[in-house]
A protein has these predicted regions:
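Signature of the SF2 helicase/ATPase Hel1-core->accessory helical subdomain module
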Residues: 1-99, 106-108, 262, 277-290
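Conserved C-terminal RecA-like helicase domain
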Residues: 1, 93-274
Length: 290
């Protein structure tokens, strides 16, 4: 694919034209092949991501590599839920103050490298399984939330310090001012992020008017959308999933709902989670991405 792109580029500029290209990751290329050598001889300005970020562009990032997904996965994902919940609270409570920064209602995205492989290898299956468990297993995740916010989490760094000790300053400040708040966070989070009311069964809705999209909901209101290429293979995995007591394994087909992905940028969008493959991140930009 890369080689065909190079051929097309050469055809476009062969009659005295030229290209001016920008790459944020060229300096990190590991394979020193012909393509690398060709580009290396043409660099006129080194503005790799390190400098791009230091000049105030891009996003802050935090990379947490888990040595044991089975042991620490629940705490890791719970920390992610708290992060999104905190950002949404701050966005609502300080919308006027942050308006000059062009920030929008926070959206969490999960980009999986595997979508419809074997069920134990599908990143997307693992994500939706966790989301369903989070809404249903109140006792477990209420405890994990309290452990994280009181620095009792078993997730530690190389110095055996709680991994989340410097995270969630806004939530921690709320708890310091009102200790009862910590008991309300799980309930409010589930209501805010998942629009969950009476139903606790995760429904998968195949949107026939939106190719590659599957809507996620517990009640009538969608909270998330899966955006992948092969929806049929993924829905087959759901139907055959054994470790999913909180799934409605019979997919619902909707011939009326429009694309949820296309509505993400709308001010009144209820979508808080975008889950899918790498296909939607190329050529797509959003101020909502958390």
């Amino acid at each position: 694919e890369a080689k065909s792109w190079i051929t097309n580029r050469k055809e476009l500029v062969e009659n005295g034209g030229f290209t001016f290209e920008y790459s944020a990751t060229f300096g990190e290329i590991t394979d020193k092949d012909e393509t690398f050598n060709e580009y290396a001889s043409c660099v006129i300005f080194d503005y790799r991501y390190k400098y791009f970020y230091e000049d105030g562009f891009g996003k802050d990032y935090s990379i947490l590599n888990l040595k044991d997904n089975e042991k620490y996965g629940d705490e890791y994902f719970t920390g992610a839920m708290l992060s999104l919940y905190e950002q949404k609270l701050y966005y609502r409570n300080y919308s006027r103050q942050i308006k000059p920064f062009n920030l929008e209602n926070p959206l969490m995205i999960f980009v999986g490298s595997s979508v419809s492989g074997k069920k134990n290898e599908s990143d997307v299956i693992n994500v939706v399984r966790f989301l369903a468990r989070f809404v249903n297993e109140k006792e477990l995740f209420s405890r994990l939330i309290k452990d994280i916010l009181t620095d009792k989490s078993s997730l530690v760094d190389t110095n055996d310090q709680p991994l989340f000790s410097s995270k969630f300053p806004y939530l921690r400040d709320m708890i310091r001012r009102d200790k009862e708040k910590i008991n309300e966070i799980y309930r409010d989070l589930v209501k805010d992020l998942f629009h969950s009311g009476t139903s606790k069964t995760l429904q998968f809705v195949e949107l026939k008017n939106a190719e590659g999209e599957i809507g996620l909901r517990f009640d009538s209101e969608y909270f998330g959308v899966i955006n992948i290429g092969d929806t049929n293979s993924f829905l087959k995995l759901i139907e055959n999933e054994e470790d999913a007591p909180y799934f409605n394994k019979t997919p619902i087909k909707s011939h009326f709902d429009k694309s949820l992905f296309n509505k993400i940028e709308k001010k009144n969008s209820n979508i808080n989670f975008l889950i899918g493959s790498k296909k939607f991140i190329e050529g797509w930009n959003s101020y909502r991405v958390s």
